[in-house]
Amino acid sequence: DARNMSMYTHVDNHFDGTHDLLTPENTTLVQRHIPGNERPDILRNPRFWISQTLAVIVSSVILLAVVCVGLMHRSLGLIPRLIRLKGTPLRSWDCHGRWKGEKLVKSPQYYARSCGFDIADEQVETKDGYYLRMHRVICNDTEQMRRGPGKGYPILILHGLFQSSGSFITSEERSLAFWLAAQGYQVYLGNNRAAYDMGHRRFSRYAPEFWDYNIRDLALYDLPAMVDYVRQRTGYEKIAFIGHSQGNATAFIALSRWFVPELGTKLSYFGALAPAVFAGPLTKCFPLSYMCKLDWPTWRRLFGVLDFIPLMKCMSWVSFQFRTIGRPLRHTRRLATRCLVRKDVSNPAYLFEWNDTNWLSRRKPKMFRFTPQPVSSAAMFWWGGKDSFVTRGSLFEPDQQWFEEHFPPLALYGGGRDRLVLTQPLVEHIRKHEPNVRLLRVKIQPEAEHCDHYWAADAVEWCFMDIVGTWTINHQMISKIHDVIGKTLSWSLYNDSPLPS
């Protein structure tokens, strides 16, 4: 029962609108938060401390076992590659030498400036008190913005599970965020709660209350707060939205008739990259096939009630340190770095089968400087525990109607090699049960895997151009409809005869 998924009784987690909300002060752009240093009383409880310590140890062992299995699996997969000796194809647009001296840092601003852009750190507060990091892409060439097809129209982009806004800025000029900004759009990158070490109005990050959330909270609070923030900052009544995996799952849940369907009146376009609505065959494989048998009491004993397997973030930090020390031992450092980056890639990558076949090798280390981001144990239980998304196979009951008339125009971008989520069942569901959904575009790229819609070397040709083309056609059509309606209303005010054709 979803009502019993809450870790503690302070949140009902059965969202019926009766629980207390925190009201933001004055504006969504609140003062810069100060991370809480005060440890809550519960940490002074030895029983809680011991249980959490044991959970960290057990979950770390589980993670290392998964990584080892993943490395063995990948090593076997390398044998055919070595036999074929097939090199990475050269692309006419790629200037490899330009990026040789690039640093490996965890700074969105650094990667933006290296491509002729900048990024502003901004933040928003949700109604339940969480501070969210927002990144606004600044295009230094204002004339280019005016000339581009976007003409200053705002787009909000939201990341997937374990990821952050950094996923959309590490592919140089061909990053989704920078490419759209170069086309004239105002680009805002959202981040879910807990990403970039953001805090809460009342709860310390050490407190279990801080981590008592799942995707339903993201749909009720985080996404609406981000959408309203972008609308407020840009002055537009409606904005475009692009979400990858959990990012679009959050939007599908928010727009459903059980949550906040009125959010659809604020969106002019919804682009879903790897739509996470129907589960793929990978969810029936190890380790997800075992995780989905765990009930909540067992889950919290294994993984705790704070963030999910914190060792993942530690491994990311260690891999970074190996790239910044030991310069005299260059060859040893390079070998160790590759091994650690492989491990860092393998823990979420093997779990969700994020293969790197279509990526540029030089980009992989910086891609994973921003991955993984902290995720609550309760959020992972929603995805992979007992009676979870993995068990059900879909976000909602497939034979029901999910969306009301406010649902925004939708474009779907799937991957032919994506085994984590499936796009075609969603298309069939929309055609059978969703008369209120206007499906603008369905594109399933045969070679694409789960993250290739923005990380693949050819993502611009596979996906980005299609997004802009679809949005432009839809926007022009809406503008023409508004013009016709406006002319009809103006004519009817002063004439009794019909509007001439």
Where in this protein do the model-derived segments appear?
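Alpha/beta-hydrolase-fold enzymes
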Residues: 8-88, 232-237, 246-394
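An N-terminal hydrophobic leader/cap segment in hydrolases
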Residues: 71-125, 135-138
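Short, surface-exposed "cap/lid" segments of acyl-processing enzymes
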Residues: 126, 131-205
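Conserved alpha/beta-hydrolase "nucleophile elbow" surrounding the catalytic nucleophile
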Residues: 159-160, 239-248, 415
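Alpha/beta-hydrolase active-site loop
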Residues: 209-232
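Short beta-strand/loop motif that positions the catalytic acidic residue
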Residues: 406, 411-414, 418
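Conserved alpha/beta-hydrolase "acid-adjacent" motif
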Residues: 419-425
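Catalytic histidine-centered segment of alpha/beta-hydrolase-like enzymes
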Residues: 447-461
